């Protein structure tokens, strides 16, 4: 079954998805065969994401749209693709 999630990662091996939610992050991880211990609830819970293990970076990146670290934060904050002054910084 094909996923309705779109995966995004950056060069620092942070991994998120759209539509963004913690539940969807865990679904994405299951789809990609990631271990729950690779989940990070960074920034006191403000920046949840998965880290891609070094040995799987090529495999996982091939299944993702590679974006900047700023775009990863925008996805988490819900401002990715939104035309506003905040989305441009």
What are these regions (language model features)?
Residues 1-89:
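Catalytic phosphate/metal-binding cores of nucleic-acid and nucleotide-processing enzymes, i.e., regions
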């Amino acid at each position: 079954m094909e996923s309705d999630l779109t995966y995004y990662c950056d060069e620092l091996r942070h991994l998120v998805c759209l539509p963004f939610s913690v539940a969807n992050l865990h679904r994405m991880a299951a789809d990609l065969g990631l271990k729950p211990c690779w989940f990070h609830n960074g920034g006191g819970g403000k920046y949840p994401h998965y880290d891609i293990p070094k040995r799987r970076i090529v495999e996982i990146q091939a299944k993702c749209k590679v974006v900047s670290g700023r775009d990863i934060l925008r996805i988490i904050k819900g401002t990715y693709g939104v035309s506003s002054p905040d989305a441009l910084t």
